[in-house]
Every structure is written in C-alpha cells, then in structure tokens.
Amino acid sequence: MSVGVAVLGSGNIGTDLMIKVLRLSDSLRMVAMAGIDSGSDGLARARRLGVTTTADGVAGLVTLPEFADVELVFDATSAGAHRHHDSVLRAYGRIVVDLTPAAIGPYVVPPVNLDEHLAETNVNMVTCGGQATVPIVAAIGRVTPVAYGEIVASIASKSAGPGTRANIDEFTETTARAIEVVGGADRGKAIIVLNPADPPLLMRDTVYCLCPDTDADRSAIIAAVTDMVGAVQEYVPGYRLKQEVQFDRVDSYLPALGGHLTGLQVSVFLEVSGAGHYLPEYAGNLDIMTSAALRTAERLIGRRAVTA
C-alpha cells in the first residue's frame, strides 16, 4: 500500500521530485504540491497531472482536505523558509525530508548513513554537491584516515533556479560540514561554480582528499571508490567516474590544516547527468538531489511500515 506525500516548493527541484514520485515510486503516492507562485510551471504541471495544488505555501497545504492523507512532506524551498515549515509540520506529526541547506535534522547521504537515521522525523539531504561527493570522501575514509576533504561542484548555470542562487552561502557551509560529519574528514571545504557555458555542461565534481598515510593501500582506495560509485548509481544512473582515481605525494605546509602534512592526495573526478524527468540531462545536480530524497523517503516509510 502506498503512502501519501506532498511537495513544498514548485520550482525546479520540487517539480522534478513530484514527477519522480509519480513515475518511479511504488511505495509513495503524490497527493499535493504547495508553492507561493500561482503562475509557476510547477503548479501548472501538477494540476495537469491530477495533483492537488495550493499557492499559499505551507499554510495552504495544511488546510487542504487531502493533507489528512499526507504522511511525509518534501521541502524543496529555501533554508530560511524550511525553519518555519518544520515548526508547522512538526505540530502535525509529519515526516519531513528537507532538500534545503537548513539542516535542522541530521545530514543523510543514502549509501553512507541512511540506515542510522531511519527513525528520524526530519532529515536533511545536504546539497547536490554533498550528495555527489560525500560518498567518495566516506569511501576513501574507510580505507585510510582523511585529514582534509575539499570538493568543487560545477553546475550548469541554467539548472540553478532562484532557490539555488539564494542559498549559495548555505550550500558551501552545509556541504563542508557534511564532508566532516558524514564523510569523516577532519576538515572539509566546498566550492560551487555556476558554469554559464552554452550549450550547458553536465554537472562535474572534483574531490580532493589529503591522507596522512603516505603508504595507504591505493588498490583498496580505488576499489572502495568504485564500489561507492556503484552504490550511488543504483538510484542515480547518470553518476559516474570521469577519470581514473589519481594519487600524488604531499609534503608541504597546508593553510587549510594550519600545519605541515606529509601524506597522500587522492583526486577523484565525477560527472553526473540527469534522467531528464523534468529538466534536461545537464541538470544532474537536480537529479542527484531528488533521487537521493526519493530513496530516503521510501526507506523512511518502509521502516515505519515494518515497525508499525
């Protein structure tokens, strides 16, 4: 039996997520979409697909008769708005999957730590860059300690809507923190690049990990990274290694660490293409977020069905 869900936010991410629920999920049933722009393409598309809509945001959502059938809400708005949404939805006892950088609930990256947070009522999906790169940092960390993890996420400017642009600072802060908390690095740093190239380029992510152990098993690191890429591909088919994993010796002062490091730099280069459910293939940054959110919601609901 499927469980009713709603989407807050009628922008790029919210609309792509709605379509994924409708097309791909056997356990989730799309009940309602709430936005604040009555003329948005997302709300118009939802209405055409038979989904109940409101342009009055979370206040409108909770007053819909259909809200009684909603057990889980995806929040695809902004970090600032999510703080209010969480307080409202918490009062109604709804599970919340947060696709903003607000991070009220714990960070969740499905192949790394989802199993640890199946009992939570609010989970945070980090950022698109976090979903693409934190699994790699975690994979390397399973073989050898990571003193410093730095990621650079390059996304097509055309795929970045107003919500993404408004959250740039939160993006870098949340992603860097997730590199540490979920990825296991002692220190983390994140950089986002909005690439204006036309035609738009696919999402590219570069992961640099500095490891104190110069003699770390390189074959084991490659195997761990390859296995993790396969785990992400289970729900994001367009996620792939762009080049072979690269290794370089490091023996220098590193300002990010505030000291000297002798060790190994591991460099991983990734590419993410989207499934094209709502936006074109180049919007892999949206696809990895919505796909991770869908996977997380299905597991959260599945866990509750088992324990009910």
From Swiss-Prot:
It comes from Salinispora arenicola (strain CNS-205). It comes from the Bacteria. Belongs to the acetaldehyde dehydrogenase family. It catalyses: acetaldehyde + NAD(+) + CoA = acetyl-CoA + NADH + H(+). Pfam families: AcetDehyd-dimer (PF09290), Semialdhyde_dh (PF01118). Its EC number is 1.2.1.10. Keywords: Aromatic hydrocarbons catabolism, NAD, Oxidoreductase. NAD(+) binds at residues 10-13, 159-167, 285. This is Acetaldehyde dehydrogenase 1. It is an enzyme of class 1 (oxidoreductase). The active site is at 128 (acyl-thioester intermediate). GO terms for biological process: catabolic process. One of its GO terms (molecular function) is NAD binding.
